[in-house]
Amino acid sequence: KLKRQERREKNVYYAVVDTNILVSAALAKDRLQSVPYAVFQGISKHLFTPIVDENIVEEYCEVMSRSKFRWNASYGQRFVDEILKYAINEPVAPTDFALPDVDDRIFYDVAFAHRDKNAYVVTGNIKHFPNVPFAISARNFLDLINPVQSQIFVNDVSVSYSASTLMSALQALNEDALKNGSAGMSEEEIVAEIKAARAERK
């Protein structure tokens, strides 16, 4: 047992979670099979620490309150608030690193500023981060932080019934999406809605 604990303490992971992972988790048709949903289970089980800054928090809040998703806006805010309880939240210096969408740079900048922690950008759109060696898909990130149990982890029925307030907040969002019919929205629709939120902020 002691050796297991020592191994866990050595495997400390940090990640900047792209907004599309939040939305995809909340809109999962089947949360027991949803990799984005399992990412947040990873936070609640302290398998990794999320990192944000005020720009990322602002985008999280704006996107999670979009009427397109048709869920209770207070549920979206509660979910963001719960993520922040686990997160490192501090300002970082902006960079001029070239990305296909300049608005994705906020995620790059935070991960880059925390490279001393080997921080990753966890995204549902890896093609949006070309030439970024620390950008990683949600599936590959789960394999990294929990390699032995990653398959069980995603399919574990306890994901639905977690007592953590983070997972309770996400479950409330997901159940609202299932009820109102917005669950299962395509990746293209999710990306379009995130872009719309960014355009309105400018």
Where are these regions (language model features)?
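Short linear interaction segments
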Residues: K1-L2, M167-K202
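Short, well-structured N-terminal submotif of metal-dependent ribonuclease cores
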Residues: K1-P50
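Alpha-helix capping/helix-boundary segments
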Residues: I21-L22, I56, F107, K127-H128
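PIN-domain endoribonuclease scaffold, especially VapC-family toxins
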Residues: Q41-T95, Q171-D176, N180
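Short beta->alpha linker loops
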Residues: N55-I56, V102, G124, E189
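Acidic, metal-coordinating catalytic cores used for nucleic-acid/nucleotide bond scission
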Residues: D96-D103, I126-H128
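Acidic, metal-associated active-site segment
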Residues: D101-Y120
